[in-house]
């Protein structure tokens, strides 16, 4: 499956008197020891944040010098629209003192993230593109993809994933390297990010065949952590802002896991900048409200459909789902000039990111209006979905 899983946080929290909430892990053995994500309250000024960070650095240095303990302190700092946060490695005494600071909203332990196995079926038929360009299911007689020749030109898509093989010839030079929050390698070792990017923008299998892909690598193997993903979002927002592209940018996150306030807040604040944020619902057939960033209302949450316009057996569902898109046996790119087939809500989200970029270019609308527009255009075609789940299936408004 193409969905990236993350270990869950329980809804329970450790209450500290007159202090910020420290979320408690559901599976303690899966937490990265002494690593935390600290999120500040909305409205904290840059000056106050800088002062707080300096205080933490000084306190951490003093504590560890006094007790001769190794430690890293603050490692990464995030500033995503209204969200100010940082991650790092702290001992229990330090984190309890941080929690008592009045500007701190909540603290989460950093957790391991793992990517699930990906199935590959060579030479399988591609069907997602023709399906999203017609109102009625015509797959038995039609394999043509109908789209406007603008094809998303002028739109940037940040693929927050395992990396992208930017040299794959099917990208026609439109894929570029952005950053990595996990290592210095520009290689997509797993192929997941390349496949996702190919569905979004490749010449042969892409929904929006003229957009620019920017690779944001947050996985170096099958595990990563929340702080790496949030760091990728932070970089994408800053890069887009620097280039005056916020309202013309898409963030695709074909990943997720146990519900996380920090992850949701990062996704929400990316949306608030003007970007279109598309995320996968999850590859476990349960309520998507259990997952993040799928449970974030400002993210466009995508469930997977099959060739018969039914909810895919593996797809998450529920009121958090905004739209369905093709997600089973999807043919796209894999590294080293190859092609392959994968299934998952990751692939469904990629279709929506591509369609979002396409509509942004065609209708000249900002990214943070795109999810509602896609839902307006979508057809009530899903013939079998779970209770309280939309029946809306992605449609690119081709007129067919």
Swiss-Prot record:
GO terms for molecular function: serine-type endopeptidase activity. SUPFAM superfamilies: Protease propeptides/inhibitors (SSF54897), Subtilisin-like (SSF52743). Residues 20-116 form a propeptide. The keyword DNA damage does not apply. Keywords: Glycoprotein, Hydrolase, Protease, Secreted, Serine protease, Signal, Virulence, Zymogen. The active site is at residues 161, 192, 346. Its EC number is 3.4.21.-. InterPro entries: PCSK9_ProteinaseK-like, Peptidase_S8/S53_dom, Peptidase_S8/S53_dom_sf, Peptidase_S8_Asp-AS, Peptidase_S8_His-AS, Peptidase_S8_subtilisin-like, Peptidase_S8_subtilisin-rel, S8pro/Inhibitor_I9. GO terms for cellular component: extracellular region. Residues 126-400 form the Peptidase S8 domain. Glycans are attached at residues 252, 396. The keyword RNA-binding does not apply. It is an enzyme of class 3 (hydrolase). It is found in: Secreted. Residues 36-115 form the Inhibitor I9 domain. Residues 1-19 form the signal peptide. One of its GO terms (biological process) is proteolysis. Belongs to the peptidase S8 family. Secreted subtilisin-like serine protease with keratinolytic activity that contributes to pathogenicity. This is Subtilisin-like protease CPC735_013700.
């Amino acid at each position: 499956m193409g969905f990236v899983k993350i270990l869950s946080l329980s809804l329970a929290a450790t209450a500290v008197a007159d202090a910020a909430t420290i979320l408690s892990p559901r599976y303690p053995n899966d937490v990265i020891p002494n690593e935390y994500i600290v999120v500040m309250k909305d409205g904290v000024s840059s000056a106050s944040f800088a002062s707080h960070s300096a205080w933490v650095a000084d306190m951490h240095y003093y504590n560890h010098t006094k007790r001769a303990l190794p430690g890293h302190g603050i490692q990464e700092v995030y500033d995503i629209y209204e969200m100010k946060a940082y991650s790092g490695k702290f001992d229990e005494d330090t984190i309890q003192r941080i929690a008592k600071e009045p500007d701190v909203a909540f603290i989460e332990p950093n957790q391991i993230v793992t990517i699930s196995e990906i199935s590959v079926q060579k030479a399988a038929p591609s069907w997602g593109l023709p399906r999203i360009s017609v109102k009625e299911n015509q797959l038995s007689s039609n394999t043509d993809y109908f789209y406007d020749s603008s094809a998303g030109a002028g739109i940037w898509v940040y693929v927050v994933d395992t990396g992208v093989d930017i040299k794959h010839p099917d990208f026609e030079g439109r894929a570029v390297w952005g950053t990595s929050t996990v290592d210095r390698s520009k290689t997509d070792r797993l192929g997941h990010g390349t496949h996702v990017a190919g569905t979004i923008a490749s010449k042969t299998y892409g929904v929006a065949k003229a957009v620019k892909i920017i690779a944001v690598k947050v996985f170096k193997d099958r595990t990563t952590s929340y702080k790496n993903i949030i760091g990728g979002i932070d970089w994408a927002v800053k890069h887009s802002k620097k280039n005056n592209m916020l309202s013309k940018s898409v963030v695709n996150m074909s990943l997720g896991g146990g519900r996380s306030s920090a992850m949701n807040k990062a996704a929400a604040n990316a949306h608030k900048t003007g970007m279109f944020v598309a995320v996968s619902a999850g590859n476990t057939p349960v309520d998507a409200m259990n997952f993040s960033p799928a449970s974030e209302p400002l993210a466009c949450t995508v469930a997977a459909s099959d060739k018969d316009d039914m909810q895919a057996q593996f797809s998450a569902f529920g009121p958090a789902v905004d739209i369905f898109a093709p997600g089973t046996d999807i043919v796209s790119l894999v590294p080293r000039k190859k092609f392959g087939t994968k299934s998952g809500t990751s692939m469904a989200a990629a279709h929506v990111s591509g369609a979002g970029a396409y509509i942004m270019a065609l209708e000249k609308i900002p990214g943070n209006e795109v999810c509602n527009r896609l839902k307006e255009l979508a057809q009530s075609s899903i013939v079998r979905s779970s209770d309280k789940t939309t029946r809306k299936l992605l449609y690119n408004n081709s007129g067919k």
